[in-house]
Amino acid sequence: MPLFLVLKATLSENVTKVSIENTNESRAEFAFDLQCTSCRELHDSKVIINTFEEYAMPASKGTASFLMKCKFCSKELSVNLCAFEDEYLTDQSDDKWAKIKDVRKKHGLSKVKEDSFIPLSLDCRGCELIKFYPDTITFEVSLSSGKVMSCQLEDNEWYDYDDNLGEEVTMTDFSSSIIKGK
């Protein structure tokens, strides 16, 4: 059963779209706490995973974004990250929202509120990702003035100023959760 990373934040009214900067030239490095599902031991440091790197899985034809062996029980652990939603739109009347709702429903995510963004699906084998750290991610924020800004969260918040409209731009009360889908 796949897991999904769900992000939520309070945005200022002049924000129209938020996405994660994740290209081959500028790869998003997602940081998580990882726990082995066999021995339940928590890995002693954050693991950093991106969607572009692939590693051949031992004794398998598949690949994964991240591989490691649990240092406590020696079990093979793997995580495969896949992009799920490209962007979060603040205007729920946009035609794209109907498609987003359909895709969420197909994956058992219809109860995820519209004020949330689901950037990743997580296929974890032998482990669980239990906490996400947003400080390694660069977000791209589109504003009603047409301006696009890049930001990184500090203490789960970001504040800036849109010179075009003379308004403050904010992303506050950032939270994340990892939920099960189907």
Swiss-Prot record:
It comes from the Eukaryota. Zn(2+) binds at C36, C39, C70, C73. Pfam families: CXXC_Zn-b_euk (PF05907). InterPro entries: CXXC_Zn-binding_euk (IPR008584). Keywords: Metal-binding, Zinc. GO terms for cellular component: cytoplasm; nucleus. GO terms for molecular function: zinc ion binding. Belongs to the UPF0587 family. Present with 3970 molecules/cell in log phase SD medium. Requires a bound zinc ion for normal folding and solubility. This is UPF0587 protein YCR090C. It comes from Saccharomyces cerevisiae (strain ATCC 204508 / S288c). The lineage of its organism: Eukaryota, Fungi, Dikarya, Ascomycota, Saccharomycotina.
